[in-house]
């Protein structure tokens, strides 16, 4: 029997599963390409920091993890994306250990789970209501 050391792993919170889950270089059949698997939480870390320009601390809080764990996820995601772009690999997005974040502000947002910017808006609403 194998025992795991340390704390139990908790699911990372993501805003939603992405609409597009596969990217590949144009003009090459997917069967001829190597692929990199980017987990949903790795994509979420890229979305929060590189797309929404959130500080690491806010992004880590939004995902329900420590800054150190967040940094490791982000570093892994950036390495995989860079490898795929430089070496012409396919990016397959899926898997990981995650949970869809519950939004308690559907009335204010009026978009519910389809909100692409739920993290920053919800964090702002949360701060305003406290």
UniProtKB/Swiss-Prot annotation:
Belongs to the UPF0251 family. HAMAP family: UPF0251. Coiled coil: none annotated. InterPro entries: UPF0251. This is UPF0251 protein MmarC7_1642.
